[in-house]
Amino acid sequence: MNFLKFKSKITNKEKIYINKNIKKIEFSLCSFLSKEFNIDITNDIDIVSGFERDWSNIPGDAEYLTRPINDIQCALVLYICNQLKIPVTISAGKTNLTGSATPMGGLILSVINMRSPNTLVNKKNKTVQVAVGTTLEDMRTEILNISNQSLCYPVDPTSRKDALIGGTVSCNASGFIPGEKGATRYWVNKIKIILPNGYNKKITRGEFISKNTQFNLQCGDEKILIEVPDYHRPKIKNASGPFTADDNEIDFIDLIIGSEGIFALITEVEFNLSNTADKYLDLFITLRSEQEAIKLRGFLEKKNIIYDLTALEYFGYNCQNYMLHKKQLFKDEMSVGIYLQYPVIDELIDNSIEKWIKLLDQSNCNIKDDDIILLNSPENWRMFFEARHSMPAKALEKTKELDAISIITDTIVPYENFNEFINFSHSILQHNKIEYLLFGHLGDCHLHFHVIYTKEEALIINDIYQQIIRKSAKLGGVYSAEHGTGKRKTIDFLECYGQEAANQVQQCKLAFDPNNILNKGNIINIKGS
């Protein structure tokens, strides 16, 4: 079914009262929302400024900050701002790296106080209902506690201690697990959304499917036709813009997930859960070269085991120079490393270790027994954990030392083109003598080039970055596998998909949001608004 009927919790009497008051010359948004509806809102610049930047550090600007506590308050804020055409930027944990929570004027709607209802785990159905203002790590911990360690939510992005649930769904956050199970989308079963006009609806996966790439929405007497974008979107780990109907059909829930808040505000979420493993086998493997690491990844895919892993992380070019404990982990300065995590289910850990040693020997990647470090002891795990997490800190130190700037690519290409893409990127950076390191999610062929450059190198870096983006698109990949588009990568979206795709996203957005108030500047820039 492609027909969705939305409801409004704002009564007609309230709408008449609101519309009468907002036309008054002396109308004050802060005063009206706080006095009439007891909504937390402020225009205190010292408070508002604390929400004007996310982790992208892109400068933002806003006049108001509101922190509603429930969806009725959210609906009232959106309805009034829509009537007044005040831009609304949705803010969650502000952990995004591309500026999707950076405001461009108007009002910031923070979901930080949307903490009701309490986390509810259904052990029989293996689901969890959770408030959008809950931090991801708090939810993950609560699920384990409530289920007596029998169920888990597997998505584990690095920012999980700070990221809020609403933001992870809006941006389709992903973690370390290779394949589709590593991204939020796979686990979302239900959401509740509020449109800019204040109307809301609960959406269940599989309930609403597009017909001829269209959805029909009804909000009271208003009928809205949604034309879903249908440009081709590579079916790999992909956070580059909203989901599309390039196969003619799309689940409505997938159109909202990962759309970075440009269509609607998410106020409730239900996730499916996974059974927990009995134990995990954690290995650090030293290899002689990057080519051997890529070869190992291909071998594991041929053995149909790569998507059973819960991590396949790569530490390559120049990483050793930014890591603690490198002598304990690597054989020599030219070595690269792989961290592998395998869930052990209905098997003794010793048997699993023996099986993996044999498997790695069969890979013909020149892996010897002393190239494998078992991380399951507390001492070894602590050593690896400190080494892994020292990289960004040391990279930041280097950046400050050089009075430099850093940029991290988020590109991804299919495995068959992976070698060509990696070699191209290495070549162009090394030819220009640019400092960088390479690490990331080898299971998805999604590695990050962390580039550190001086202000004098800014022009050449911009050119190099665009060449890397163009190369990824040419090889069937995309510019963003996990970080999204936000405001920082709108040019990359055009480079990857073209103007026609941007036009399709614009048409879809303006059907949901005719006044273009929600998350202006995310994914695309709409001229004249």
Regions found by a protein language model. Name each.
Residues W55-S56, H450-E457, R488, E495-C496:
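Conserved PLP-binding active-site segment of the aspartate aminotransferase-like
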Residues F3-F6, T42-F51, I256-D463, K471, ...:
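C-terminal substrate-recognition/cap domain of FAD-linked oxidoreductases
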Residues A473-T485, P514-I517:
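Alpha-helix capping/hinge segments and adjacent helical runs
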Residues D40-I45, T66-P68, V88-A92, G99, ...:
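General beta-strand structural signal in soluble alpha/beta enzymes
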Residues M1-Y79, T95-V128, T158, E268-L273, ...:
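N-terminal flexible segment immediately upstream of the FAD-binding catalytic core
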Residues Y199, K489-S529:
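Activity-critical C-terminal alpha-helical subdomain
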Residues P117-L120, V132-L296, L518:
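FAD-binding subdomain of flavoenzyme oxidoreductases
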